[in-house]
From Swiss-Prot:
One cellular-component annotation, GO: membrane
UniProt protein name: Cytochrome P450 monooxygenase claT
GO molecular function: heme binding; iron ion binding; monooxygenase activity; oxidoreductase activity, acting on paired donors, with incorporation or reduction of molecular oxygen
EC number of this enzyme: 1.-.-.-
Record's bilayer topology term: Single-pass membrane protein
Chief localisation class: membrane
Pathway(s) served: Secondary metabolite biosynthesis; terpenoid biosynthesis
Keyword terms: Heme, Iron, Membrane, Metal-binding, Monooxygenase, Oxidoreductase, Transmembrane, Transmembrane helix
TM spans (from-to): 2-22
SUPFAM superfamilies tied to this protein: Cytochrome P450 (SSF48264)
UniProt keyword Transmembrane helix present: yes
CDD domains assigned to the protein according to its UniProt record, in alphabetical order: CYP64-like
Catalytic activity: wigandol + 4 reduced [NADPH--hemoprotein reductase] + 4 O2 = arnebinol A + 4 oxidized [NADPH--hemoprotein reductase] + 6 H2O + 4 H(+); arnebinol A + reduced [NADPH--hemoprotein reductase] + O2 = clavilactone A + oxidized [NADPH--hemoprotein reductase] + H2O + H(+); (2E)-geranylhydroquinone + reduced [NADPH--hemoprotein reductase] + O2 = isoalliodorol + oxidized [NADPH--hemoprotein reductase] + H2O + H(+)
Length: 496
């Protein structure tokens, strides 16, 4: 009797799986691993190095990979062409995302459009020019801190990025490594990816909302409290100190007090608060990840470091620090920046774009509600675009190319996202990272740390999985490039 039950159960499982397989193929869904009833592909999903693992699936399934997680359809886009065809050219269909209050997670509607308009108004290429002196000052102060305590280079990068963002958003200068607003914001960002994941899990399995005592509910309550603190406290501080900063040209002052003199309504002010919060989340971690990846790359590739430093010396000299005005005359440094962004990929995956209606592409049916995730890491390590993708090789960007080739090869085409959800902060983030990188090249040399016997300890090129791809903690030696560096850095005076 027992054997009959077992056999019947196995037969039922086979029938269910077969029906699931046939149903998928009849609907011409894109290929992907076959899941199991109810859970779908939940057990197939990687718990770490998600972008790299899913990129590897392309060898079997191609550049469009379809999976379901507890009934929710996902489409992973590993190829640049497929991503641009769908998320850029058909952005009207692929712009939904309603997973939280931050701008990148807001549903595509009137609120999102207002918030994006506010961000574009403050972050256009022309608008961010007013912050170039601030970028220079914070970069130079970062150099001074590294000179004084080189072993704390990561905290120095974090303070520089935090102060740069907080000053440009709120007109608030960060004066210590223990600044309460920066610490609160970093704490929030450290848990945000986990909180978002918990939110997705409830979306996949709605019945979990009604199961008491789950850790998810406790975490959701903590997320809500931290979200409100992060949004409300900096804004309240900004308004309380308005009278003390009459010359402040920050993002919040510009938007709260328009030049036309017309007061804004309460709804617009509420949106400004959320936009300000989103700008910190998007800008600070990206800057720290990019610059720490750069330092790691220079340690691992001393020949690249030396070649870039020689170019800086030839153009800038050794009697001053680089400025943004030098950028056009430093083509190899530009190549190093691009290769760092490609090799390190500070943002490996995009936030999901929800498909608002059924679509068809290359003979495949894409169901309404599908969450489309662009695998930026896969695109930036695609050997069809970047031969020898795992080699750190800045020279790949040299030589004559037409406009389309240049666009496809430039990592910024991918790093800042796609379609109507492309990050508008590119005009602020890119110059900030470039100036930080070239200033470090100008003043310091980065080499491996030494063990007790004086042997070099080469750090591995390993990265922490998460929304932002930071290198695993590593040690190194940071030494002034020449005897004039200390005096050069010390002579820098705050401009504000």
């Amino acid at each position: 009797m027992l054997s009959l039950i077992v056999e019947a159960t196995l037969l039922l499982v086979v029938l269910v799986l077969s029906a699931h397989y046939v149903r998928r193929r009849m609907k011409s869904l894109p290929p992907g691993p076959i899941g199991i009833p109810i859970l779908g592909n939940m057990l197939d999903m990687p718990t770490h190095d998600e972008a790299q693992t899913i990129a590897g699936w392309s060898k079997k399934y191609g550049d469009m990979i379809f999976v379901t997680i507890a009934g929710t359809p996902f489409l992973y886009l590993n190829g640049a062409k497929e991503t641009m065809d769908l998320l850029d050219k058909r952005s009207a269909l692929y712009s939904e995302c309603d997973m939280g209050g931050l701008v990148p997670l807001t549903g595509y509607g009137d609120r999102f459009k207002l918030e994006r308009r506010l961000m574009n108004q403050a972050l256009s290429a022309r608008a961010v020019e007013k912050w170039e002196p601030l970028v220079a000052e914070e970069t130079n102060m970062m150099l001074k801190r590294i000179l004084d305590a080189p072993e704390r280079f990561i905290p120095h990068l974090r303070r520089m990025a935090g102060s740069l963002i907080f000053t440009s958003i709120y007109g608030y200068r960060v004066t210590s490594d223990d600044d309460p607003y920066v610490k609160a914001a970093e704490e929030f960002m450290s848990v945000s990816s986990h909180a978002i994941l918990n939110g997705w899990l409830v979306d996949f399995l709605p019945f979990l909302r009604h199961v008491p005592g789950l850790t998810i509910h406790k975490k959701a309550a903590e997320w809500k409290i931290k979200m409100e603190e992060w949004v409300e406290k900096p804004h309240a501080m900004f308004k309380a100190t308005l009278a003390d900063n009459p010359d402040d040209n920050s993002f919040c002052r510009t938007l709260l007090f328009p030049e036309d003199g017309h007061p804004i309504d309460a709804e617009t002010e509420e949106r400004i608060k959320w936009v300000a919060t989103s700008m910190y989340g998007a800008g600070s971690d990206t800057t720290v990840a990019s610059l720490s990846q750069f330092i790691l790359a220079m340690i691992l590739h001393p020949e690249v470091q030396k070649k870039a430093q020689n170019e800086v010396d030839a153009v800038v000299g050794r009697d001053r620090l680089p400025t943004l005005d030098d950028r056009a005359r430093l083509p190899y440094v530009e190549c190093v920046l691009k290769e760092c962004l490609r090799w390190g990929t500070p943002v490996p995956l995009t936030i999901p774009h929800r498909l608002s209606q059924v679509d068809e592409y290359n003979g495949h049916i894409l169901p309404e509600g599908t969450l489309c995730v662009a695998n930026i890491w896969a695109m930036l390590h695609d050997e069809r675009i970047y031969p020898e993708p795992h080699r750190f090789y800045p020279e790949r960007y040299e030589g004559k190319m037409d406009a389309e080739q240049t666009r496809l090869l430039d990592p910024s085409t991918y790093i800042f996202g796609f379609g109507r959800r492309r990050c508008p902060g590119i005009h602020f983030a890119n110059p900030s990272v470039w100036l930080g990188m070239v200033s470090l090249l100008s003043t310091f040399t980065f080499t491996p740390s030494l063990d007790k016997k004086g042997r070099e300890i080469i750090p591995p090129a390993k990265f922490i999985s998460g929304t932002f791809r930071h290198p695993e903690p590593f040690k190194c030696r940071i030494t002034p490039r020449h005897e004039g560096v200390p005096a050069l850095i010390e002579q820098v005076q705050p401009a504000f």
